[in-house]
């Protein structure tokens, strides 16, 4: 609410005001005016209503809002008026007989802390109507007598609030700010009514935070805001020197009001209503920032005062900044005063206590009031505090001198908005009201009335900087607040703005404060008895007068925006808090109080730094460790490779899982198992699936296998017979050197081979059980096929009988068909890649040139930036003289294309001969699965004729013959082939457009050549025409012997691998990403016993096939038995 706005429910109770000109009327006349203004005061029937009116008036008093400077020039006159009024205020009709009053009411009121004379007079005036009426009367009387003001406020609340335990309040010695207007007498609560009003309701803990704030409706509150919180009113007006205090620098860009005029509240306190204060209060009243009361949660004493819901903590509000003399104190009355972000440090306790004892200049020792420092520094201009002046006069000794705010009022720093930030445990400071309550009894009688020692947790403004008595000890209970000392006993959470009080020139203790000012140590002054010996204000300790207000040089910086978001900059915070902490031993008491604040805050300091620091400390051990991690940093391309292949394999695994489940269901249906048996089988499959997922993550290495013998050596790998260490099972292990795969650009081919071997779920393809890799090599662990390959058999036999050729070609047709059904093209069907198992049936192997037309099978996918390397399907310079290449002439394309084709001829690539490769593959004109049927025709020719149809001296000539197959293909008559065999060869070895098999393998199966083959039955179940001879499980006699010179030696392997791979790494390449998703483990791996244990050759031979193919059903039923598994396999 803007200052000039009138809150809802505003009542025109604006008392008479004094003229702006110098006041020259006599004291008697002034007293008359004041009395007239008092008659106009509203008289609410009950305290709550009065409080409500108070809140309205206090927050709405237009005089306070709009004419704050009006009395700025009347300090001297007001002081004179005060002096003249003091005798009247002190007059008590104690002579009246108590017989005229209700003894019970008298006793209750006295118990509440009211002076006997005051109570008797009130009861007499109200005809013993009710305690509330008496309290209301006392409230009016308190306008005339400052000491009564505090007692009325302190005592009335407990009574009206049914003496709620939470209503423990401390009387605040407050000097009435007799500005000559009843406005100054009326509690100036300009905030929203009760609920929102900063004015503390009688039940509100804040009401006590308005230390001495009178009952609502009573003018006491007005005085409370402006007067000492000791409950004692300093009757003798302070000398006019009070004016000497220069106004503090205007907040945030406001020009300082002329001296002697009370500037309107700072812009940051929109709702603060400047109150009229007595001349004494003209002194800068320490700006009360929303400092959380004493120890509440987190060490702050719980808000002892029963915070009435009417007075919710004003979290958004900020305390009042110190206002210099001549400047109206900023009254934080409206709960909307300071809508500090609740996140503000000051709001950490949830109460943005704008209520903070705005009236408190001095906080009792027990009170730990955290008041965020004003955004601007207090200047030494506030030469003498009203208390200092008063000490010189009849006023009670001020707890702070020279305009310096009492330690309780002092704010450690902007960051110390919460009690936890302040050292609630300050030695001298009594955080617990109960302690301070005992102090009140000891405190010098400030108001002559002993204010009940309700002991709310008194949050004292910890002026860690200003507080010369850094230890709250300075606020000892014995110490008596000066007349101007407003000892605000703020209930733990000050939920309502405290009544306005003179705020000392704001201390630049914000988080952005330039530097921690060198505070002048302030001598601890002994407490002087207040001029009016009134009962000791409970819990009201007098702050010794501050020697001198801190002097800042230059105006403070404006609040930065980030402060409003609870991010006070860390450096200022440290500059303020740390110096006091480090210099603690030598610092004056004010710094000691800051130390106490530091002590309390120490536990939360780091956390606070984390929350308030805008700068994140990056350099820590964890970060360094993270940087030093051994995990390699891969390129984005590597991530692309991994994710593309990983996602594909994850989806594939899911599909395979569904397939296995369906397969099991079909098998159980076919077998006709009972329901219980089916359920058991399903459970077993589920368990096996779970185990499989776990096993797939198990790392494998070559140490798990023992090499027995080398079976063959290829272009960049070798095949050897190996035994698995744990299961003793025999496997054929194919090892590929990564360096050769990379250099020959065979990554795509290896990936394609791995895929087809892993996906192959039929008996025509060698089964892959495991694939894994290490730093240097890739490993395929496959079925060991002891019968050797077709080439070895061809070499031994020379020419096959047509019946044997028919049998093998029929099985080869079925094998190629199975590969095509899986979506692959072998592209390298030749006798070397056809293996014969122990029962004489064939299996396809070596899918190094196989492709599935997948992006992972494309060599270009694995090439980055360099010029493209040629794969094994390109022409090799070993084929002949490159100058004889006629690719350009033959293709007749653009010259660039011809040049590229010629480069292919020059490129190193294919190892071996192109005898079995279809012409479209060599020409790269585009090919389909039909290219494999070409190879079948060539193999049939070789079986029956004894040599390939396109045999030549060099690979290049062979390639030329293949390309010119129309003229080079001749079936020699001496071979004496049957017309069916010749016709089949001719129909398979022709152009793809009319090649047999174009419409599927059935075309081939229907050819007359296979008229004696029953493709409808499983060929593998038929007896083979040739059964290889196997003498023992590790018999390798069916394989051609390996040249010892070509054998891999471990030493050479290490040297070659290291040299080659080091070269790759030196060039900045990371080829390892080419082998992502290479690892594989078969679901049905025969438990590691593809052939069981070695048995007699005959027995093994008979049951070999069954043992190779696993049956999930049998596997689950027989447990360790591994034979006859042919139902479920992958």
Curated annotation (Swiss-Prot):
It is found in: Cytoplasm, Cytoskeleton, Microtubule organizing center, Centrosome; Cytoplasm, Cytoskeleton, Spindle; Midbody; Cytoplasm, Cytoskeleton, Microtubule organizing center, Spindle pole body. Residues 705-1010 form the Protein kinase domain. Residues 526-655 are annotated as: Interaction with YAP1. The modification Phosphoserine is found at residues 278, 464, 613, 674, 909. The active site is at residue 828. A motif (PPxY motif 1) lies at residues 373-376. The modification Phosphothreonine is found at residues 246, 1079. It catalyses: L-seryl-[protein] + ATP = O-phospho-L-seryl-[protein] + ADP + H(+); L-threonyl-[protein] + ATP = O-phospho-L-threonyl-[protein] + ADP + H(+). Residues 1-11, 46-64, 579-609, 621-630 have a biased composition (Basic and acidic residues). Autophosphorylated and phosphorylated during M-phase of the cell cycle. Phosphorylated by STK3/MST2 at Ser-909 and Thr-1079, which results in its activation. Phosphorylated by MAP4Ks; in parallel to STK3/MST2 and resulting to its activation. Phosphorylation at Ser-464 by NUAK1 and NUAK2 leads to decreased protein level and is required to regulate cellular senescence and cellular ploidy. Disulfide bonds: none annotated. One of its GO terms (cellular component) is cytoplasm. Complexes with CDK1 in early mitosis. LATS1-associated CDK1 has no mitotic cyclin partner and no apparent kinase activity. Binds phosphorylated ZYX, locating this protein to the mitotic spindle and suggesting a role for actin regulatory proteins during mitosis. Binds to and colocalizes with LIMK1 at the actomyosin contractile ring during cytokinesis. Interacts (via PPxY motif 2) with YAP1 (via WW domains). Interacts with MOB1A and MOB1B. Interacts with LIMD1, WTIP and AJUBA. This is Serine/threonine-protein kinase LATS1. The lineage of its organism: Eukaryota, Metazoa, Chordata, Craniata, Vertebrata.
